[in-house]
Amino acid sequence: MPHSTHKELLLGIMAGTAGISLLVLWYHKILKPRTTMIFPKFLSLGKKSDSLTLQDESYSEQGTSVVFQRGQLQILEKLNELLTNVEELKEEIKFLKETIPKLEECIQDELGVRVTVHQVSPQHRARKKKTTTTTVQRPATSNSSEEAESEGGYITANTDTEEQSFPVPKALNTHIEDLKLDVLLQKVDHLRLNEAHKMESFELLCDHKEKFSEEIEFLWRLVRAYGDMYDLSTNTQEKKHYANVGKTLGERAITRAPMNGHCHLWYALLCGYVSEFEGLQNKINCGHLFKKHLDIAIQLLPEEPVLYYLKGRYCYTVSKLSWIEKKMAATLFGEIPSSTVHEALHNFLKTEELQPGYSVSNYMYVAKCYVDLGESREAWKFCNLALLLPIVTKEDKDAHKEVKKIIGSLKR
């Protein structure tokens, strides 16, 4: 019985008890005196009538006394019963108060052990419907769950422990195909070209994680896949999980292969994803890491269009930073991050130069830059180019909506 229901019942009982007590008091103080005061009016009717009246009075008083005593006994019995019930309810409430916290602890402990209780995102539920056989659960590794300090200077849990917290259902079948590294990498890259197959690409990498976790070409692709899962997920806790695990794997990758541009690229991107869930200090910290490793990746992969797109986004964001955010960054790193809309535009146009029609989002940002610079004609041009591109990813869909908003503002 809920606590509020007990409380209402107790109040009702107390009100009822008070009502009965008032009834008894009313009888003693008002009703009984009135009965005795009526009798003297009949004394003036003569001796005979006086005698009869006195007899009637005596009989009436005795009868009333008996009835009243019986009524009192019944009331006392009811009161005693009510008081007993009140005491029982008090004991029950006390028991519930002591039990509920223990029950909550038990539930938390149970959830801590049975991680499969995790709520699956809509994408995962859709995939589950396609599965016709029982999901094969990968064996848990015996790695320690101790925490390690990340390159960014704050604490992140070890990767293996975190990865087990969010099991991913098989998209197609439960058979784990044992592939050679080169065949696996080709298949993963091919699957990832299609937005609908990115989850399968991620699963394939996870299935071979124990076998190829020391291979750098495998590792940076796994980091990239965690970034893909971040994009696919609609659940905030899942997105946070994929971002943190991917960032931790990315740190491992850049440590083992500091001259591999792809390691720096995808580590930088995961730092950006993690920053979405951080406070101002860690957000700025992640932004610093993002810029640092993006610049390294550009030096190592100067012809990779995605790098210039990401740098353009960084420059555009920094150009919009508030004074307090810049001051905080200066306090943390000794320098104020600075960039301009012109610098952002240069990087977005470089992306277009390396790969024309790179994405709806790239055109959208070019249009935004031109709007900020007061060049409406150029903004119109790139908005129209953006509308011509197909909508493939969620990012494309969001960018398409933003383009329509820009067009609306240009029409005013």
UniProtKB/Swiss-Prot annotation:
Q: Where in the cell is it found?
A: Membrane; Cytoplasm; Cytoplasm, Cytoskeleton, Spindle; Cytoplasm, Cytoskeleton, Spindle pole
Look up the coiled coil feature and give its residue ranges. Answer: 72-110
> Which molecular function GO terms apply here?
microtubule binding
- Identify residues that carry Phosphoserine: 51, 121
| UniProt-listed InterPro entries | RMD1-3_a_helical_rpt (IPR049039), TPR-like_helical_dom_sf (IPR011990)
Q: Which residues carry this modification: Phosphothreonine?
A: 141, 156, 159
Transmembrane intervals:
9-28
Annotated region (Disordered) at 122-153
Task: Say which domain of life the source belongs to.
Answer: Eukaryota
One Pfam family matching this protein: RMD1-3
User: Sorted alphabetically, which Gene3D superfamilies does this protein's record hold?
Assistant: Tetratricopeptide repeat domain
Q: What membrane topology term does the record carry? A: Single-pass membrane protein
Cellular component terms (Gene Ontology): cytoplasm; membrane; mitochondrion; mitotic spindle pole; spindle microtubule
Supply the alphabetized keyword list.
Coiled coil, Cytoplasm, Cytoskeleton, Membrane, Microtubule, Phosphoprotein, Transmembrane, Transmembrane helix
Into which family does the record put it? Belongs to the RMDN family.
Subunit structure, per the record?
Answer: Interacts with microtubules.
Name this polypeptide is given: Regulator of microtubule dynamics protein 2
Protein species of origin? Rattus norvegicus
**Lineage per the UniProt record:** Eukaryota, Metazoa, Chordata, Craniata, Vertebrata
Query: Gene behind this chain?
Result: Rmdn2
